[in-house]
Amino acid sequence: MAIPVNVKKWIDENREYFLPPVCNKLMQNHQLKVMFVGGPNQRKDYHIEEGEELFYQVQGDMCLKIVENGKHKDVHIKEGEMFLLPGRIPHSPQRYADTVGLVFERRRLDTEKDGLRYYVEGTTEVLFEKWFYCEDLGTQLAPIMKEFFSSEQYKSGKPDPAQPIGKMPFFLNTEQVMEPFSFQNWLNKHRLEINQKKRVSLFGHNQETKAVVYGSGESKDSKAQTDTWIWQLEGTSCVTLGNEVLKLGSGDSLLIPEKSLYSWIREDCSIALSTSQVPA
């Protein structure tokens, strides 16, 4: 049964999970993972996955450390900013106290592998890494980190010749990442276009992340091939899902399960963000 969730209220009710040692809480955990992350959480490990990740800073700033084309780079995502990280780029989120960030990622395909990697300090030489099929990142990372901290590589700060780094299951992405941008400024700039076209994509059609802002209008008998998360930003709308009629007010969210048939009526002055991730 689909149930609308008010985002602000949900964040306030779950703030205890945004503190160490947990630092995150999943709002939705299906084909689409919708999670909120807090801090402080400073880390040395880098995560690598084949899919994209979408970041939006709800409260406070964060720094996303990445390795872009063989060079370390800090991507500073400020409060209210959005950033789409392409797949296959090593990344290490650095979060601070009293911050809350929204992160989207998707369920992995059966053929996909995730990696956890540590670098030799100050370089891009791989010190230690493990590849695994990701089912629950929150529980799977801890044993790998524990293995690293008890390893010869951690003690010496150098790769262990007895444990050579194996071949990666895929090539790293060589594209240059985008600059984070203010979501509110984007909305203000595109309001006229949203009113005229009824829907405007944030990232175009070449990415697996489909983030679309909808204005007033109606979507009849739509088929959700993957999970779709709706966030009603302004005004109201009404979603008919099976025999259920669900009303969304400002700040409410709703997950439409994959392979569902639904209709969506958006009233005048309605602004809503629809997010889904379709594996490439």
UniProtKB/Swiss-Prot annotation:
It catalyses: 3-hydroxyanthranilate + O2 = (2Z,4Z)-2-amino-3-carboxymuconate 6-semialdehyde. CDD domains: cupin_HAO. Gene3D superfamilies: Jelly Rolls. GO terms for molecular function: 3-hydroxyanthranilate 3,4-dioxygenase activity; ferrous iron binding. Pathway: Cofactor biosynthesis; NAD(+) biosynthesis; quinolinate from L-kynurenine: step 3/3. It is found in: Cytoplasm, Cytosol. The keyword Metal-binding applies. O2 binds at residue 43. This is 3-hydroxyanthranilate 3,4-dioxygenase. It comes from Xenopus tropicalis (Western clawed frog).
